[in-house]
Amino acid sequence: MAVTKELLQMDLYALLGIEEKAEDKEVKKAYRQKALSCHPDKNPDNPRAAELFHQLSQALEVLTDAAARAAYDKVRKAKKQAAERTQKLDERRKKVKLDLEARERQAQALGSEEEEESGSARTLEQEIERLREEGSRQLEEQQRLIREQIRQEQEQRLTGMAKNPENKETPKLKLKWKSKKEAESQGGYSRDVLLQLFQKYGEVLNLVLSSKKAGTAVVEFATVKAAELAVQNEVGLVDNPLKISWLEGRPQSAMGHNHPGLSRGSVVSERDYESLVMMRMRQAAERQQLIAQMQQEDQAGQPT
């Protein structure tokens, strides 16, 4: 991470909302609170979220490293003193007109101060470059904790752990398939693959793969109709079918239909039957296209 003029102009303490004498643990606590509220994953509609999150990360890196923080404090102090001198000079100019000798002395003094400030800035840049090359373990750990907290919040919301009887439940389905925990292929089902399979039935609000149990995921639909269509028609990949069951928001009309397809006792019209056949044909074509695409990507990723 190279130093920027914007970073030198920034008040990192004010950005994190802490005192100048704050200890490392206070800096980290303030970072987690600020970064969690503006994390890009939680603010997809805020174009400045990513920029602010990056600035907070820079602040954490600088203020939790003793050498980088000392260099930054020196630059900050020099700028503050320069601003105070400028203010005093402005007030003095309103009363008297400085003669040439005074201006020459002032220019020499400012030149020396600017050289010192430039040296401090170079020191700060070197410290930040060192942090970039070595890698900031503290920053990575804090960001990992934030990602884990966001993932847990999403899983809790999808599985109904945060219960509120006043909220209207959105339909959620539980997906299962054969997959070994250590297998990187996840049984052929990644998040993108599952989204392609289920988005054709309607808007998917969220989809989370379980981090604890392999071959398990939860999909949340915007409408009950979309969830019903998925339960009735989706079978997944041919070589590794999906088992789909209701988790929340199951309508009364869906009671007794826990597997894809229509029940034996249901009566459908000829038009309904034709629609179902066409949907199954589209599903088969989409699955074949998806399998071919994955095979091409695997071949492209193999060394030649």
Swiss-Prot record:
One GO-annotated biological process of the protein: negative regulation of transcription by RNA polymerase II
Disulfide bonds: none
GO molecular function (one): RNA binding
Pfam families hit by this protein: DnaJ, RRM_1
Modification Phosphoserine, positions: S112
SMART domains the record matches: DnaJ (SM00271)
One GO CC annotation: cytoplasm
Location within or outside the cell: Cytoplasm; Nucleus
Domain spans labelled RRM: 178-249
Keywords: Chaperone, Cytoplasm, Nucleus, Phosphoprotein, RNA-binding, Transcription, Transcription regulation
CDD domains assigned to the protein according to its UniProt record, in alphabetical order: DnaJ (cd06257), RRM_DNAJC17 (cd12429)
Keyword Transcription: yes
J domain span: 11-76
Gene3D superfamilies in alphabetical order: 3.30.70.330, DnaJ domain
Function: May negatively affect PAX8-induced thyroglobulin/TG transcription.
Designated name of the protein: DnaJ homolog subfamily C member 17
Gene that encodes the chain: DNAJC17
